[in-house]
Amino acid sequence: MKTFREFVLECNSVQESSLNRIRTKSQKGGTAIVSAERGNKSLAENRARSQQMDRDIRGKGLPGATKVSGRYDERGDDGKTTKVKERSHVVSSGKMGKRKFSKAVKSLGKKYGQDSVLIQKKPGGSASLQATRKGGLGGAKSINVGKMQPGTTGEADTKIKGKTFTYG
């Protein structure tokens, strides 16, 4: 029989394993973070879009995504930026090549009207925000954001089970 202390330690290690799993995937191959949610949509509509994105990710031949929550500065159609919290999907490239993986993730971002998607093509390499619509990144096609940094927060960060990480 476990003591309460052993139980709490086991629960904490389980929470960290998901972040650890994402970090391991990032070190072993390409990963991307993409979302279907928009700040101007209702909660129910955003939830339905996220569920549809799950199906679309598998439909593109990618392995299933890990669901996370993220914060991002979203640029509206009028040019104003607003901070939004959204449900995001961390996708690994699986056996897909770098170029095909990048195109698949960008097409998902375009389909759901996202400003950009975060793509890390090389194992353990630096990631970049890739624009998926005109004006999404203020005119730039891509912005290099750096390597994954678990346990840190920034202006755009991601959280999974209480643990945060960012690229920078």
Place the predicted regions along the sequence by residue.
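N-terminal, charge-rich interaction modules
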Residues: K2-T66, T164-G168
